[in-house]
Design a protein with these regions (language model features):
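Periplasmic-binding protein-like
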Residues: 92-103, 121-125, 164-167, 193-194, ...
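Hinge/cleft segment of the Venus flytrap/periplasmic-binding protein
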Residues: 9, 271, 275-319
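Flexible loop/hinge segments that line or gate small-molecule binding clefts
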Residues: 107-144, 249-257
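Hydrophobic alpha-helical segments within soluble ligand-binding/sensing domains
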Residues: 137-163, 248-252, 268-285
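Hydrophobic membrane-insertion alpha-helices, especially the h-region
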Residues: 8-24
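Structural motif
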Residues: 70-93, 194-213, 227-229
């Protein structure tokens, strides 16, 4: 046998040994199987930057945790006159395995939960309701935000100035709860407060002009659309009225830069969206079966600090 033949024989034997070892240890190279969860995020919030940031956080988590996610906002279906119950049922009929739900009405939320099969886990975002279907509650610390607003108003307030809380009469339970807290906390800080509910946002014109002409007034609103409407009046009419509030949108950012809005509390919607989807997918895959309540904080934003690095992740998470 020549040297060349011996080399070929050795290579053949080596190949046979390697194949035997692979088969005996069941070491077969395959494409990794990935379980994809079919989930829905269904919300009832204005089409502002909070909605966009929440959606972006949810999308990022869906990619990271292999979820096929549908993001639905009730406001997109106003022309079709579709209600929240119908949206949820549509997703269930389409094979949805889990839901992240945000609803402006506690009563409606409870009705929806009653009709969701027990085997479908639900993560509530900024919504209060009790049900065995609810596996996690994700919200923001309302009391902390109310204290922050009272603190900022008190710091800037001149002696004798009072506060007017302004919102639309049909706003969500959550927003009304915020104003309930503020109505309680301002007097504790020695600040007189009154409450005004608008039947239509167009009424902001007369309200702002009246308060500005009267003098001695500061305005706080946790209704972003009311805040935007009042800031627009200040800009168009050239009136000066200290405006404070809660919310985040392109218009609020613009009015902060123009100093028609003094400051706002902005919640970490991106973080809330990411955690909600992360939690839901881990429940579905069996990695996390613990019920959990998570509260996200807010940051104080003014025209001067909104582009600080410490606030970028909350205000502009996908910039």
């Amino acid at each position: 046998m020549t040297v060349k033949q011996k080399i070929f024989l050795f290579v053949d034997i080596l190949i046979l040994v390697v194949l035997f070892l692979i088969s005996s240890t069941d070491y077969i190279w395959k494409e990794r199987k990935v379980d994809v969860s079919n989930i829905s995020v269904i919300v009832d919030i204005p089409q502002d930057s909070i909605n966009l940031n929440l959606q972006e956080g949810a999308k990022k988590a869906a990619q990271a945790y292999h979820a096929d996610m549908h993001f639905l906002n009730l406001h997109d279906y106003e022309a079709q006159q579709v209600d929240m119950q119908t949206l949820v049922q549509r997703e269930l009929d389409a094979g949805c395995e889990g839901i992240v739900l945000q609803c402006g009405s506690g009563r409606v939320t409870e009705e929806i939960l009653e009709n969701i099969p027990v085997g479908v886990p639900v993560v509530l975002w900024d919504t209060e309701a009790e049900s065995p279907r609810v596996k996690a509650n994700v919200s923001f610390d309302r009391e902390a935000i109310a204290r922050l607003l009272v603190e900022k108003v008190a710091e800037a307030r001149d002696k004798g100035q009072s506060v007017t809380l302004v919102s639309h009469k049909d706003r969500s339970d959550q927003m009304q709860n915020m104003h309930d807290l503020l109505e309680e906390m301002f007097p504790q800080a020695g600040i007189m407060v009154r409450r005004v509910e608008l039947a239509d946002y167009a009424e902001a014109n007369a309200l702002v002009n009246g308060l500005a002409a009267q003098g001695g007034n500061m305005v706080v609103s946790c209704d972003p659309q009311a805040l935007e409407a009042m800031a627009a009046v200040c800009e168009n009419e050239g009136c000066t009225l200290p405006l404070y509030g809660m919310g985040w949108s392109g218009m609020i950012r613009e009015q902060l830069e123009k100093e028609n809005i003094t400051g706002v509390a902005v919640i970490d919607a991106y973080g809330a969206g990411y955690f909600s989807v992360q939690k839901l997918t881990m429940i579905l895959t069996g990695e996390d079966q613990n019920e959990e309540e998570r509260k996200f904080q807010a940051v104080w934003v003014t025209g001067e600090n909104m582009y600080d690095r410490s606030r970028e992740a909350i205000l502009f998470p996908f910039a």
